[in-house]
């Protein structure tokens, strides 16, 4: 995108490349991430506590977590629906309306659809059987097993209006793509959820999931916002998804 620069971070355990593109008059921010181990893909909560009344800016949470790159999560503190797994524990079970995205210890993304997990016991067994470390519940699923999804109605995210969007996708084993679509400069077009699916599908991502959008849609790279959040400012929120280096702090900072 005119006027933007490519940013990157690289060490022996992680490669991150961030860039912007103007697509159909939308400002699209992308971050490609490759990691050495699934443990480098993590979730952080504001105040490091589930259910805390403390909301924080994503840059603060990313800094506290020593994140190389981060994207907003599902903003679980703003709603009461969905399934929340954090550090392998089930904290919220209200699955009847949202598709969920689970993250395994090996770094894979696994989707569930409405009606697949109907009891807390089923969720706990699913977590154990698949070695789940955390989950997010926003959605919908944008791409699944290489098939682009079409969503016309959904409980959250105002899917049928033009809106800022955020998404996370898994390209391959330990290989991911983050995406944010916002208004920036002369690029004024926000997108519907199906247009967001088109954009990440066009990047060759076989599995992708929508995160909270609007002003929440934020990517943090090297400690600073990389995209332009709505109204030009970060908003306080409750959670981020982030990638960390596996090198100890002193080595990574040298």
Language model: regions and residue ranges:
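Zymogen propeptides
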Residues: 1-100, 108-111
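A short, polar/proline- and glycine-enriched secondary-structure boundary/capping micro-motif
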Residues: 52-55, 119-126, 187-194
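Short hydrophobic-aromatic micro-motifs
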Residues: 69, 109-111, 142-144, 150, ...
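Short, conserved active-site entrance elements at the starts or edges of catalytic domains
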Residues: 132-155
């Amino acid at each position: 995108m005119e006027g933007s620069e490519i940013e990157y971070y690289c060490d022996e355990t992680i490669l991150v490349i961030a860039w912007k593109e103007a697509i159909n008059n939308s400002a699209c921010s992308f971050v490609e991430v490759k990691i050495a181990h699934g443990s480098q893909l993590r979730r952080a909560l504001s105040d490091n506590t589930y259910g805390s009344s403390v909301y924080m800016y994503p840059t603060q949470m990313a800094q506290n977590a020593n994140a190389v790159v981060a994207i907003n999560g599902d903003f679980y503190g703003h709603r009461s629906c969905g399934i929340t797994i954090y550090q392998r524990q089930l904290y919220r079970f209200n699955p009847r309306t949202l598709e969920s995205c689970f993250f395994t210890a090996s770094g894979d993304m696994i989707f569930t659809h409405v009606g697949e997990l109907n009891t807390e016991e089923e969720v706990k067994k699913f977590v154990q059987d698949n070695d789940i470390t955390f989950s997010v519940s926003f959605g919908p699923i944008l791409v699944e097993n290489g098939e682009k999804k079409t969503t016309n109605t959904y409980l959250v995210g105002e899917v049928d209006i033009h809106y800022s969007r955020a998404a996370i996708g898994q390209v391959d084993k330990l290989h991911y793509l983050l995406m944010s679509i916002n208004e920036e400069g002369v690029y004024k077009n926000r997108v519907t959820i199906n247009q967001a699916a088109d954009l990440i599908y066009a990047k060759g991502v076989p599995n992708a999931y929508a995160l909270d959008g609007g002003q929440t849609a934020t990517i943090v790279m090297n400690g600073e916002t990389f995209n332009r959040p709505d109204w030009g400012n970060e908003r306080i929120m409750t959670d981020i998804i982030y990638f960390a280096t596996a090198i100890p702090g002193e080595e990574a900072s040298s």
